[in-house]
Curated annotation (Swiss-Prot):
Changing A224V: Decreased function in DNA repair. Changing A370V: Does not affect DNA glycosylase activity. The gene is MUTYH. Changing G25D: Does not affect function in DNA repair. It comes from Homo sapiens (Human). Residues 19-51 are annotated as: Disordered. This is Adenine DNA glycosylase. GO terms for biological process: base-excision repair; depurination; DNA repair; mismatch repair; negative regulation of necroptotic process. Coiled coil: none annotated.
Length: 546
């Protein structure tokens, strides 16, 4: 018998041993978010339990670790197969992960600030900024934005005194623009209402600061203040799902609560900030969504997903008889709500990527718009007209080219667009309006197609005054203004159609060919910053990740 077969045979024998029966007590779900917040407030001073967030009836929690009732109690039972069996296993997981992190962690600017900054409020602020920027955004993209932000506003007081226009301008291109606005709102509240001091616990951070949810509050509290509280983001959820063979949708209420319970159980009370960052780092660089590097994983020996792969390999080779015990992880309670769903059974080709199985995402709704780059000569060069979006809704407060919703015919479209232009700039020659191409830009929930038009005012008296909410900018000013990535794409299409520039025909998705010759700044930063590190797939939120 080969060493591998011998090892897996012993593993198979261990995993076939009977497991503790699981109780199935039920409690009522919290009636509303307000009720859950009130519960959190009443318990904000309570010491976090090692099993906080786990279903109380579950008998599989490690002996010696206290249990705490759920905020939202779910009518489901959990098999001990999806838990850590004892304190020794939890301790082994912590030690292996932290040892790996100490050796392999990436040198990131927000980590350096958190380690070097002695003032607790400034440290918490630095962590807060990084966590908000990293939501749904890749690390390589965030590095330059974070560095520029902290140089411009190194303290809460600096950010609180900034204008929203300045915040939008620096945030331009980072996406999810409400994040920057909420961050400034929070800074102002800390300065004006909290005496300039950040709340010190995850509970009070979430209660008092606008836009700070459970994850962000936990990250700030653990990294900046050393509170032993777990966190779950997209990376951590993936790690936990694989380590405990949780195949159900992580976004479901049941699975989400279970993951938060596991995170709270595992967090190292001596190094909570490092532990949480280590779990996120593992998901971002090793336990990736596709092609995970299992051979480099520090907790591979504790990973049930990896054990399942080895079992299946033995069964396929004929070295073991019978059927896997995984689907019978809760034989006394019926179908397990955390295992792979019956509709999506084990796929041999996926390996550990079987865990978790996410629900199919609803495709973004499709919308169309017509937008026009209106240009006129100016003393410092050509000027283009921008108008400001409303202060609420998509891209709130940002600047864009005059736009209208798409009309069913070209004639109606030109008429509507010309009327919009004249509303801001006065009478214009309709014959000069040219259709240049299209740009498709996908937001989180909208796939928006822009039909791009151009109108150059040549030989006319320049427009010197415009209504409030509009302004003329030079091309240089445009590139530093608070405009969205979609508008920058639109402008590149316009530039590609002008004499003396890189000409191009009607196109979609991306802009002019000349803009594709150089890699994006984020990619350049990624290549240079992580050249000495292992290459990984881009990390996805909520994902995501980041």
């Amino acid at each position: 018998m080969t060493p591998l077969v011998s090892r897996l045979s012993r593993l198979w024998a261990i995993m076939r041993k009977p497991r503790a029966a699981v109780g199935s007590g039920h409690r009522k779900q919290a009636a509303s978010q307000e009720g859950r917040q009130k519960h959190a407030k009443n318990n904000s001073q309570a010491k976090p339990s090692a099993c906080d967030g786990m279903i109380a009836e579950c008998p599989g929690a490690p002996a010696g670790l206290a249990r705490q009732p759920e905020e939202v109690v779910l009518q489901a039972s959990v098999s001990s197969y999806h838990l850590f069996r004892d304190v020794a296993e939890v301790t082994a997981f912590r030690g292996s992960l932290l040892s790996w992190y100490d050796q392999e962690k990436r040198d990131l600017p927000w980590r350096r600030r958190a380690e070097d900054e002695m003032d607790l409020d400034r440290r918490a602020y630095a962590v807060w900024v990084s966590e908000v920027m990293l939501q749904q955004t890749q690390v390589a993209t965030v590095i330059n934005y974070y560095t520029g932000w902290m140089q411009k506003w190194p303290t809460l007081q600096d950010l609180a005194s900034a204008s929203l226009e300045e915040v939008n301008q620096l945030w331009a291109g980072l996406g999810y623009y409400s994040r920057g606005r909420r961050l400034q709102e929070g800074a102002r509240k800390v300065v004006e209402e909290l005496g300039g001091h950040m709340p010190r616990t995850a509970e009070t951070l979430q209660q008092l600061l606008p836009g700070v949810g459970r994850y962000t509050a936990g990250a700030i509290a653990s990294i900046a203040f050393g509170q032993a509280t777990g966190v779950v983001d997209g990376n951590v959820a993936r790690v936990l799902c694989r380590v405990r063979a949780i195949g159900a949708d992580p976004s479901s209420t049941l699975v989400s609560q279970q993951l938060w319970g596991l995170a709270q159980q595992l967090v190292d009370p001596a190094r909570p900030g490092d532990f949480n960052q280590a779990a996120m780092e593992l998901g971002a660089t090793v336990c990736t969504p596709q092609r995970p590097l299992c051979s480099q994983c520090p907790v591979e020996s504790l990973c049930r997903a990896r054990q399942r792969v080895e079992q299946e390999q033995l069964l396929a080779s004929g070295s073991l008889s019978g059927s896997p015990d995984v689907e019978e992880c809760a034989p006394n309670t019926g179908q397990c709500h955390l295992c792979l769903p019956p509709s999506e059974p084990w796929d041999q080709t996926l390996g550990v990527v079987n865990f978790p199985r996410k629900a199919s995402r609803k495709p973004p709704r499709e919308e169309s718009s017509a937008t026009c780059v209106l240009e006129q000569p100016g003393a410092l060069g050509a000027q283009i007209l921008l108008v400001q979006r409303p202060n609420s809704g998509l891209l709130a407060g940002l600047w864009e080219f005059p736009s209208v919703t798409w009309e069913p015919s070209e004639q109606l479209q030109r008429k509507a667009l010309l009327q919009e232009l004249q509303r801001w700039a006065g009478p214009l020659p309709a014959t000069h309006l040219r259709h240049l191409g299209e740009v498709v830009h996908t937001f989180s929930h909208i796939k928006l197609t822009y039909q791009v038009y151009g109108l150059a005012l040549e030989g006319q008296t320049p427009v010197t005054t415009v209504p409030p909410g509009a302004r003329w900018l030079t091309q240089e000013e445009f590139h530093t203004a608070a405009v969205s990535t979609a508008m920058k794409k639109v402008f590149r299409v316009y530039q590609g159609q002008q004499p003396g520039t890189c000409m191009g025909s009607k196109r979609s998705q991306v802009s002019s060919p000349c803009s594709r010759k150089k890699p994006r700044m984020g990619q350049q930063v990624l290549d240079n910053f992580f050249r000495s590190h292992i290459s990984t797939d881009a990390h996805s939120l909520n994902s995501a990740a980041q």
